[in-house]
Amino acid sequence: MRIYLIGFMCSGKSTVGSLLSRSLNIPFYDVDEEVQKREGLSIPQIFEKKGEAYFRKLEFEVLKDLSEKENVVISTGGGLGANEEALNFMKSRGTTVFIDIPFEVFLERCKDSKERPLLKRPLDEIKNLFEERRKIYSKADIKVKGEKPPEEVVKEILLSLEGNALGG
């Protein structure tokens, strides 16, 4: 079993992923953390020194490497789940879960974040990116509302996984 969590930045993928992995008693991996470990740089530093294209390629490589593991929960970066090729790859290897949040919730959660390169863009550009990515994220196997407390999001995912296993 491989569970991939996708969604926009600040949707709660890492928090939910950590809790979900504990509930299932399987390891949790955060693609962003693994990218930073591999490069020895923060994500903003990678963007600045090597560019977004390099980061996106590396992110997909890390995803593929993590997907060699069995029985894992993998939290993806916001851009990875919006990459159709990456999303199709994840769907072929496991179950994709879209943690959906309203744009207003994203703004509230991310307002103090200095570590996210995409937040340097104008607000209307971020809103457009949010809407574009949401269309792709919606192709996930399971969709949950991420504005609820993380423990409730985990319960909803677990129920959906049970339903999928039973053919529901």
Swiss-Prot record:
GO CC terms for this protein?
A: cytosol
Instruction: Return the InterPro entries for the record.
Output: P-loop_NTPase, Shikimate/glucono_kinase, Shikimate_kinase/TSH1, Shikimate_kinase_CS
Required co-factor(s) are:
Mg(2+)
Enumerate the UniProt keywords alphabetically.
Amino-acid biosynthesis, Aromatic amino acid biosynthesis, ATP-binding, Cytoplasm, Kinase, Magnesium, Metal-binding, Nucleotide-binding, Transferase
* Residues where ATP binds: C10, S11, G12, K13, S14, T15, R116
Q: Does this UniProt record's set of keywords contain ATP-binding?
A: yes
Q: Does the keyword Iron apply?
A: no
Q: How is the cofactor bound?
A: Binds 1 Mg(2+) ion per subunit.
Coiled-coil stretches are none
Tell me which Pfam families the record gives: SKI
Instruction: Quote the subcellular location field of this record.
Output: Cytoplasm
Q: Which residues bind substrate?
A: D32, R56, G78, R133
Which reactions appear under catalytic activity for this entry?
shikimate + ATP = 3-phosphoshikimate + ADP + H(+)
Gene Ontology molecular functions: ATP binding; magnesium ion binding; shikimate kinase activity
Q: Where does Mg(2+) bind?
A: S14
Quote the pathway field.
Answer: Metabolic intermediate biosynthesis; chorismate biosynthesis; chorismate from D-erythrose 4-phosphate and phosphoenolpyruvate: step 5/7
Which superkingdom does the taxonomy of this entry point to? Bacteria
E.C. number: 2.7.1.71
Predominantly, its location class is cytoplasm
What role does this protein play? Answer: Catalyzes the specific phosphorylation of the 3-hydroxyl group of shikimic acid using ATP as a cosubstrate.
Family to which the UniProt record says this protein belongs? Belongs to the shikimate kinase family.
What is the protein named? Shikimate kinase
The organism's taxonomic lineage, starting at the top: Bacteria, Pseudomonadati, Aquificota, Aquificia, Aquificales
